[in-house]
């Protein structure tokens, strides 16, 4: 059984959580920083949801306690602070870190 934690701050993150929730031998915990994000994730069957901002210490505690196989960072591309905290907490706990990035878009004008 793979235990995954997905920080789902984008629509791609929610799509990933939905897809993972349908896979065999996969348990998913989805983290959102806001109540609204949590409500969207709670619509996906079989997913544990955390709808609150986690600081680095809280992330470390969660990763240790749950023993995730992987942590997926699907936060917004410009959310560098949270990405840094997730990376550090993963490194400190020996948890595999994966980053899901959307393609950059160009703005003309």
Residue ranges and their predicted role:
Residues 1-4:
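Extreme N-terminal starter segment of soluble prokaryotic enzymes
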Residues 6-8:
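Conserved N-terminal Rossmann-fold NAD(P)-binding element of oxidoreductases
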Residues 10, 32-36, 103:
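Residues in the short beta-alpha loop(s) of Rossmann-like NAD(P)-binding domains
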Residues 12-16, 37-40:
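Short N-terminal binding/cap micro-motifs at the start of the first secondary-structure element
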Residues 16-26:
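A short, Lys/Arg-enriched amphipathic alpha-helix followed by its capping loop at the start of a domain
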Residues 29-53, 108-109:
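N-terminal beta-loop-helix "entrance" segment that forms/cooperates
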Residues 56-57:
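Structural motif corresponding to alpha-helix initiation and N-cap regions
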Residues 60-109:
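Glycine/small-residue-rich loop that forms an oxyanion/phosphate-binding "nest" at active or ligand-binding sites
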């Amino acid at each position: 059984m793979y235990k995954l934690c997905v920080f789902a701050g984008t629509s791609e993150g929610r799509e990933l959580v939905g897809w993972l929730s349908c896979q065999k031998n996969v348990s998913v915990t989805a983290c959102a920083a806001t109540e609204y994000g949590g409500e969207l994730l709670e619509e996906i069957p079989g997913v544990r949801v955390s709808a609150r901002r986690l600081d680095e210490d809280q992330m470390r505690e969660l990763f240790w306690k749950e023993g995730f196989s992987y942590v997926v960072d699907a936060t917004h591309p410009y959310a560098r602070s949270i990405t840094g905290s997730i990376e550090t907490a993963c490194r400190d706990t020996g948890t595999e870190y994966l980053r899901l990035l959307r393609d950059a878009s160009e703005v003309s004008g």
